[in-house]
Structure formats: structure tokens, C-alpha cells
């Protein structure tokens, strides 16, 4: 399950300093904050497993003329949480086939109370992180001058207040549960497929 939020923070004295060979967005120009729910000092957790928050500041390559406040840096935080395996969530093959005759996957999946509780915690952690950095959480059209921008951004699923549907951020939805036998799992405790010898 994932939550995406944009924000602005005051620029630092080095914010506009040119960077030689700037890193790609998904590389060294971003950061990752892990959050484990099994830490002993955490007492307000009502979900299992954990999540991490991926983010960056001033790495989106937004031209200055599009920025509403030139004295602020624009950043994003995207929290990705672990989804519990449940028998109800499944992938099966449809009787329908694609243009090459291959059966189309049929995915049955929904968030459980665990993931929805985690999403609320992720949202709260993102808010606290932005506040700790003296920043403000804002919608993307509050940060940038995009002609007719709100017409495009108001319906973007990733920018909505609630978590996007399962599979929107593809890496949060697993499909091969680990278990003790082939009847209830795809892989064994060593992550080996039951059906491969």
C-alpha cells in the first residue's frame, strides 16, 4: 500500500548551487527512510509489518518559471508498505485470452484493515517528517504554475487523499506467499518454488 505527498521547504544557501553530473531521480538524488513496526519504543502501532518512505527534494527538475514560490524547494515523499498475504487475495487465469492466445490473469485483491491502518500511520509519519523539516505539505498545483494544471492533477489517483487501488504502485502487491506446504503457499521457507526441482 502506498501514499504519495508533495511538499515545500525553505531553500538553503546551497539549494541553487549547480551540481556537476546531477544524479538520476531514482539514484543517489533521493533518500529512503525505513520504518519498522516492531521497534520496542513504538507503542501506537495497530498494524503488522512495516514500511519505508522514499523521497527527494529539488530533484524533480522543475524549471524555476513554473515554481510558484522561488524561495522554496519542492520535494515528495512516497511511503510503500508491506501487504500481508491473505488467501482471499489471488491471481488466477481467465478463460479469456489475449491476442496471442495466452490466458489473461484475473486478479482478486483488496486492502485489509491492516493495510488501511498502516496507510493512516504512513500519512501521519509523512506529515511529521515534513513539519520537522520546517516544510508544508501541499498539492502539486499549489507548488507549480501549470496552465490548466488542476484539470489534470485533480483526478490523479496517486495524488488523492486515500490510498491508490491495489497494484497502482506495482511493487507493493506480492503474489507468491511463503509457507510450510504446497497447499497454502508457492514457496518454502527458503524461498524455493514447491514445483521446481
Where are these regions (language model features)?
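FAD cofactor-binding and catalytic pocket of flavoenzymes
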Residues: 1-117, 160-177, 184-186, 193-194
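Hydrophobic (often cysteine-bearing) scaffold residues that line and stabilize catalytic clefts
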Residues: 118-122
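Non-transmembrane alpha-helical segments in soluble domains
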Residues: 123-131
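An extended, acidic, His-containing surface patch that forms the Zn2+-binding/catalytic region
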Residues: 130-190
